C-alpha cells in the first residue's frame, strides 16, 4: 500500500473546486484542517490518501473557529538543523547515491533499480474529477538527513551533548529523547527526521522478549534473510505508481518482528518529522511481521513545518500477519494464516480534501478471502462543519466467494447554528461548543486507541486551524 499526502498545497494536490481562478489566490496553508474518515475492519486494509488545502478564505463563524496560530507553536515551527541534502531530481544516479549513502548491500540496490524501471513505465494516476497540477519529481529532493544523530546510552536516553536543536525539536513535539523529558517507559518510539531514523527508545525490554524493533536501514544490514523474505510481499513494487516510486527511493522507516507466540511488551510507534524549507520528500518504508500466535500494537504520526510550498510524504507500510497473530495498525496488511486478525483504526485531520481507497486482501480460513466464511465490515462516519463542507463515499465491493460476508456502512452528520446556539444559551462559547461536539463525535475512535495516542489525538483536535474550508 502506498500512503501519499501533501503537507500544505502541493503540486499534485487535488483542488476542491473546478474553478481555476481560485488557484491563483495567495494563501498560507497549514498542515491540518479537520476532516475525518474513520474505517474499521477486522481484515487487512489498504488506504491511499491525498490531503490538500486550496487556501479559500473563511466565510462564516464556523470556519473562523479554525483560525489561529496554535499549530505553528506546537508542530509548525522550523528549526535550523545542520543537514546533508542531495541535489534535486530523480534518476538512476539518484537511486545509486541514496543506496551508497545508506551503505546498503548490492541486492537492495538491484531491488531499487528494478522498481525504478517499473516506475518509468507507469503514469501518475488521475484521481476523481478534481483538477490539480502534475507532480514535478525533478524539482524535488529525495534525501535529507541531519549530519549528527543522537547517541543513546544504555537507558535509551540521548546524550544532551548531541545536537541540542535536534533534541529540543523532538522534545517540543512530545517525543522526548533526553533526560530533561525522560522517555515514556510505556511506548517504544522510532524517531525519524526527514530521511533518517535518528533514535529508537526502549529497545532493551523489547530485546528481552525477542522482539526486533529497529530502522529498516538497520534491518537490511542485520537481518537480510527476514527482509528478503517479507519486503514487497504485501505491496509489490509494481502495485501502483507511488509504490514503485517508494520502492526505488525509500529512505527510512521502521522494521518490527514479533516471534512466534510472543506478545509485544509495549506499544510501538514511529514519529516522522519533516523539517526542510526545500522541496524535500519523505519516503517511509515500514515492515511489520507478526509470527504465529503473536500480538503487536503499532501507531505512527507525521508532522511538518507550516509550509507555503509543497512537501511530499509517500509511504509504503507492509503488515504480515501469520496464523493466529494479531496486529493493531492503520494500513494495508495480509492475513496469511487461519484466524489471523488486523484491526485498522485511522484518524485523519487535514486539508480540504481527504481521499481514501481502502481495500481488503482476503486470504486464510475465517480471516481472508479466498477461503470460507471470510467477513469484512467497514464503517465511514463523517461530520460536516460549515455550509461548504461535503463528504462523498464511493464503496466498491467485489466478492468472488459466496460464503464471504462484506458490509459497508456510511453516515453523515452536520453541526448546525441551532446546536451552537443551544450551547451558547448555557454560557458555553462558540469554540468550546464546537470542540465538545467534535470530541463526542470522535469518542468511539479514541476509545480504540492506546491511552497515550488517544490523548494526543484529542489534543490535536482542539487546535484551531487557519485556512480550513470546511
From Swiss-Prot:
Top-level taxonomic group: Eukaryota
InterPro entries: Fe-S_cluster_assembly_SufBD, SUF_FeS_clus_asmbl_SufBD_core, SUF_FeS_clus_asmbl_SufBD_sf, SufBD_N
Record Pfam families: SUFBD_core, SufBD_N
Biological processes, Gene Ontology terms: iron-sulfur cluster assembly
Entry similarity comment: Belongs to the iron-sulfur cluster assembly SufBD family.
Name of protein: Iron-sulfur cluster assembly SufBD family protein ABCI9
Gene source species: Arabidopsis thaliana (Mouse-ear cress)
Lineage of the organism: Eukaryota, Viridiplantae, Streptophyta, Embryophyta, Tracheophyta
Amino acid at each position: 500500500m502506498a500512503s501519499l499526502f501533501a503537507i500544505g498545497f502541493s503540486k499534485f494536490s487535488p483542488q476542491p473546486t473546478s474553478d481555476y481562478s481560485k488557484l491563483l489566490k495567495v494563501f498560507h496553508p497549514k498542515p491540518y484542517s479537520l476532516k475525518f474518515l474513520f474505517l474499521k475492519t477486522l481484515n487487512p486494509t489498504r488506504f491511499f490518501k491525498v490531503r490538500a488545502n486550496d487556501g479559500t478564505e473563511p466565510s462564516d463563524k464556523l470556519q473562523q473557529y479554525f483560525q489561529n496560530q496554535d499549530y505553528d507553536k506546537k508542530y509548525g515551527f522550523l528549526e535550523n538543523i545542520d543537514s546533508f541534502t542531495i541535489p534535486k531530481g530523480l534518476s538512476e544516479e539518484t537511486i545509486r547515491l541514496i543506496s551508497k549513502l545508506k551503505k546498503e548491500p548490492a541486492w537492495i540496490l538491484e531491488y531499487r533499480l528494478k522498481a525504478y524501471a517499473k516506475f518509468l513505465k507507469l503514469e501518475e494516476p488521475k484521481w476523481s474529477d478534481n483538477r490539480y497540477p502534475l507532480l514535478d519529481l525533478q524539482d524535488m529532493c529525495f534525501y535529507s538527513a541531519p549530519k549528527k544523530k543522537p547517541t543513546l546510552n544504555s537507558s535509551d536516553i540521548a546524550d544532551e551533548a548531541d545536537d541540542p536543536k535536534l533534541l529540543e525539536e523532538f522534545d517540543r513535539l512530545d517525543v522526548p529523547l533526553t533526560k530533561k523529558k525522560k522517555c515514556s517507559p510505556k511506548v517504544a518510539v522510532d524517531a525519524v527526521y526527514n530521511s533518517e531514523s535518528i533514535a529508537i527508545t526502549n529497545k532493551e525490554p523489547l530485546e528481552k522478549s525477542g522482539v526486533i524493533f529497529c530502522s529498516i536501514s538497520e534491518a537490511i544490514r542485520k537481518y537480510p534473510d527476514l527482509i528478503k523474505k517479507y519486503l514487497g510481499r504485501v505491496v509489490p513494487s509494481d502495485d501502483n505508481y507511488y509504490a514503485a516510486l517508494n520502492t526505488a527511493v525509500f529512505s527510512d522507516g521502521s522494521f518490527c518482528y514479533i516471534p512466534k507466540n510472543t506478545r509485544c511488551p509495549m506499544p510501538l510507534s514511529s514519529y516522522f518529522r519533516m523539517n526542510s524549507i526545500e522541496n524535500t520528500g519523505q519516503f517511509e518504508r515500514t515492515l511489520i511481521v507478526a509470527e504465529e500466535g503473536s500480538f503487536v500494537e503499532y501507531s505512527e504520526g507525521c508532522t511538518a513545518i507550516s509550509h507555503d510550498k509543497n512537501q511530499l510524504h509517500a509511504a509504503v507500510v507492509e503488515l504480515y500477519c501469520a496464523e493466529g497473530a494479531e496486529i493493531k495498525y492503520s494500513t494495508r496488511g495480509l492475513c496469511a494464516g487461519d484466524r489471523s486478525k488486523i484491526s485498522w483504526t485511522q484518524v485523519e485531520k487535514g486539508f480540504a480534501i481527504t481521499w481514501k481507497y481502502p481495500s481488503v486482501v482476503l486470504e486464510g480460513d475465517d480471516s481472508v478471502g479466498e477461503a470460507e466464511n471470510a467477513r469484512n465490515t467497514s464503517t465511514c462516519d463523517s461530520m460536516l462543519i460549515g455550509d461548504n463542507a461535503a463528504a462523498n463515499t464511493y464503496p466498491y465491493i467485489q466478492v468472488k466467494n459466496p460464503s464471504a460476508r462484506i458490509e459497508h456502512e456510511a453516515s453523515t452528520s452536520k453541526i448546525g447554528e441551532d446546536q451552537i446556539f443551544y450551547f451558547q444559551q448555557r454560557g458555553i462559547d462558540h469554540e468550546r461548543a464546537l470542540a465538545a461536539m467534535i470530541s463526542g463525535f470522535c469518542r468511539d475512535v479514541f476509545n480504540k486507541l492506546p491511552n497515550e495516542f488517544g490523548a494526543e489525538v484529542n489534543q490535536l483536535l482542539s487546535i484551531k486551524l487557519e485556512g480550513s474550508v470546511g
